[in-house]
Regions:
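Short coil/turn segments at secondary-structure boundaries
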Residues: 30, 78-79, 381-382, 429-432
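Structured non-transmembrane domains adjacent to transmembrane bundles in polytopic membrane proteins
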Residues: 54-75, 82-166, 393-607, 617, ...
Length: 772
């Protein structure tokens, strides 16, 4: 550091960290110990998947059904499968099954039990389903699910599988707990191997893991209290926090430790730490801000799962940045020169490793690319477009039990139900109809008959069922049957009517995700219903509401991310074109990542190898989630590399030289950071939750492509093709400071000295004019 330069605030921050290093470590240790027990309990208190739009028409309809008919989301479907292929649809068999399940009726939380009456598929008579209505709300049912499951009696000669919303949510919570452990078992050792290869010592390699684990545990512990206060937090949150916290926490620590090790070569521990905070610490702050853009944008979509990802992502990134600028520097200050302790290899091999690092590998690649920029650009873009192509045929849907693999009882039971019954009836559109009088009053019968007759004539309707079906279309027949107490009791038992409320099931001609089914839901909601007040809900309506919520704000999300990213890069690079190029390249890596996800999860290519049970669709929320996360991380790598190129360009005025030196300075570190992020995030590919598998695969592919093919090949090629135009901006807007000092520590410019190996780049061969 120059003697005449003024220390920056971050330099002084590093000095203070060094002087208070023991107190800072003890404070973090105390915080970790306090929050760890709550972090471990977080998955067990999350009761919702976060898909349900608050106050949506479908949610209002469900509430009306629960109030008026006692139809609650807290229910179970018990799928009974005969071991001897006995016909369980026969009356005697169904009577026997209900008798064997009769002990359930004595339980205080069981409201009713009855056989499902939906249309059946041929050849599956050995499978039947029993609906168990619970006298509990959804949260209480989930908390008592294991007790409920334990009280289900066995059926002689048959196997029983419990599914339904409550069972699926319970299994999802179990999957979250096991997935976190599995991902850590896979990801942390893999990250440690990469860190050992980068640093060469066990001491240095362990520090980023400590920072990552502390960031995750602290974040999850803090979010435990938020989840207690807000019951809508998604049960995907712990997986997301673990994935992102380990990835960015270890990546940020990699930058800090790398710079500190290099500075220790020629400085004492205090000065080395101060310079590390002023350079690498600044880069980590800027990187954290870049990643926060995408997470902030998620909050614009009014769905609990997006809000949960947004809160979790923002919190864990902020904590990771804080840990990287407080805990980690304090640990480094305590270690000092002992950071080089416990080497992995003998000294002679370590020296050879240094020679390889200084061999100019990345510089040579850059110069080769810039010698053939057109050919390489065309080849790389063609390859990426080929990976992006499957996105054109992407079919999005909202999963339910499909988020779990078939080894889970709730998923397997759901698959059996789909086999045995008409899927369209199981996922029918449900209309809660408020009648003008009691359901057996002629006015109510007349009004509901007019409504159902009109619905039957609508395009896309296969069948309409209601309590009027007992009269086969005749008002007189309906009145005749309703005069019998046993018929009324049976209708009320099956939750078809009660007082002034009736339920109408509209079975669509097509699947629940078909465009005509979606239009049918919209038509039902806008049609005139004289004498009735109708609320349209059911699975197709519920999923349509989710899609509408996303589409309502997607333009705002994209616009916010692009606009804020452009402004930040415009300020950082003082260039009009470079931010546009960065966004274009981010979209290429993002599109390629989504393309691979479509190949695997929709088309089934490689699905068996990855343990994916593909359904021919993609989780509808996935493209937005991947976009928001990848865009921030890719911008992080872009800033890391282009800032170093800019520093060399402003010093030399030579675009080609600056590009080669920039890649040489940052290529190894960007690749290492990307590999660490990829193995941590990629570990979730081998977990049970299909949504997290897809997110893990998409992020891994996108980040690896961004840090390798795009940063190593496409960036140098475009830098060469655009030449000095890369650096153009109006003088009145952002004047460029040419011939700036290389002492980046003492400037206010955005720098990525933290992303370098600590070596100053060599001067170019030609002479440069002295700075005025």
């Amino acid at each position: 550091m120059r003697q005449d330069s003024r220390p920056t605030p971050l330099y002084r921050w590093g000095q203070q960290i060094y002087r208070c290093r023991k107190a800072i470590v003890l404070a973090w240790l105390a915080l970790f110990c306090v929050l760890l027990p709550f972090a471990l309990k977080l998955p067990s208190i999350l009761e919702h998947n976060g898909f349900t739009p608050k106050d949506s028409p479908s949610q209002v309809g469900l509430e009306k059904l629960e109030e008026g008919l006692g139809l609650s989301a807290a229910s179970l479907d018990m799928v009974v499968v005969s071991r001897t292929n006995e016909n369980l649809t026969a009356g005697t068999a169904q009577k026997r099954i209900l008798e064997e399940l009769a002990p359930l009726r004595s339980l205080p939380y069981v409201r009713d039990i009855y056989m499902k009456t939906s249309s059946r598929q041929t050849g599956e008579d050995h499978i039947v389903a029993v609906k168990v209505l619970l006298n509990l709300d959804s949260s209480e049912a989930l908390r008592r699910f294991e007790e409920i499951r334990g009280n289900v009696p066995g059926i002689a000669g048959a196997d029983t599988y419990i599914t339904g919303n409550t069972a699926v949510f319970a299994d999802m919570n179990e999957a979250v707990k096991s997935d976190i452990i599995r991902a850590e078992i896979i990801g942390i050792p893999a990250a440690l191997l990469i860190l050992l290869a980068v640093f060469g010592t066990w001491t240095a390699a362990v520090l980023p893991l400590i920072a990552g684990l502390v960031s995750v545990a602290t974040t999850m512990g803090a979010l435990y209290f938020l989840a207690l206060a807000d019951g809508s937090i998604s049960n995907f949150l712990p997986n997301a926090v673990t994935m992102l916290g380990l990835a960015v926490g270890i990546d940020y620590a990699l930058l800090i430790v790398s710079r500190f090790k290099e500075e220790l070569r020629c400085r004492d521990a205090e000065n080395a730490l101060a310079i590390t905070c002023a350079t690498a610490g600044k880069a980590v702050m800027f990187s954290g801000g870049a990643v926060l853009i995408g997470f902030a944008a998620m909050s614009f979509i009014d769905l609990p799962i997006f809000r949960s990802f947004s809160i979790g992502g923002i919190t864990v990134v902020v904590v990771s940045v804080l840990a990287g600028n407080t805990l980690l520097p304090a640990l480094l200050g305590m270690l000092g020169d002992r950071i080089h302790a416990l080497p992995l290899l003998p000294k002679r091999y370590r020296l050879h490793r240094e020679d390889v690092r200084r061999s100019g590998f990345w510089r040579n690649i850059s110069r080769f690319v810039m010698a053939h920029p057109v050919i390489i650009s065309i080849a790389v873009i063609a390859l990426l477009l080929a990976a992006i192509y499957p996105v054109r045929h992407m079919h999005i849907a909202i999963p339910a039990a499909e988020v779990l693999p078939p080894k889970y009882e709730s998923r397997y039971g759901n698959d059996l139900m789909m086999r045995a019954y008409d899927v369209r009836e199981l996922n029918s559109i449900v209309v809660a109809a408020e009648l003008p009088a009691a359901y057996d009053d002629p006015r109510s019968i007349r009004a509901l008959k007019a409504y159902t007759d009109e619905v039957r004539m609508m395009p896309g309707v296969k069948q309409v069922d209601s309590y009027l079906s007992i009269g086969r279309g005749s008002e007189e027949e309906v009145m005749k049957y309703l005069s019998r107490a046993d018929i009324r009791e049976q209708l009320e038992q099956y939750r078809l009517v009660r007082d002034k409320m009736a339920v109408v099931a509209v079975v669509p001609e097509y699947g629940e995700t078909h465009a005509l089914t979606a239009q049918l839901v919209r038509d039902l909601r806008t049609m005139d219903t004289p004498g009735l007040v109708t609320y349209v809900t059911g699975s197709p309506a519920y999923k349509l509401d989710i899609m509408d919520k996303m589409q309502e704000h997607i333009v705002l999300v994209l616009g916010f991310v692009f606009a804020v990213t452009y402004v930040i890069l415009l300020i950082a690079f003082r260039s009009v074109l470079l931010p546009l190029k960065a966004s274009l390249m981010n979209m290429l890596s993002l599109g390629a990542g989504l393309g691979v996800v479509v190949w695997v999860f929709q088309e089934g290519i490689g699905a068996d190898w990855l343990g994916v049970s593909y359904t021919g669709t993609i989780f509808a929320l996935l493209p937005i989630l991947i976009f928001c996360v990848v865009f921030g991380i890719s911008m992080d790598y872009e800033v890391m590399m282009i800032s170093r190129i800019m520093e060399n360009y402003e010093r030399t005025g030579d675009n080609e030289y600056a590009t080669a030196e920039g890649l040489e300075s940052t290529g190894g570190l960007i690749t290492s950071a990307a590999l660490i992020l990829a193995v941590v995030v990629g570990a979730f590919i081998f977990t049970d939750n299909e949504v997290m598998k897809a997110i893990g695969l998409g992020l891994t592919v996108a980040v690896l492509l961004d840090a390798t093919i795009i940063r190593v090949l496409l960036v140098p090629a475009f830098m060469k093709l655009l030449g000095k135009a890369n650096w153009w901006s109006p003088r009145w807007l952002l004047p460029r400071r040419m011939a700036a000092t290389t002492a980046a520590v003492t400037t206010d410019a955005v720098t990525t000295d933290a992303a370098t190996t600590g070596e100053n780049p060599p001067e170019p061969a030609q002479k440069q004019k002295p700075a005025p």
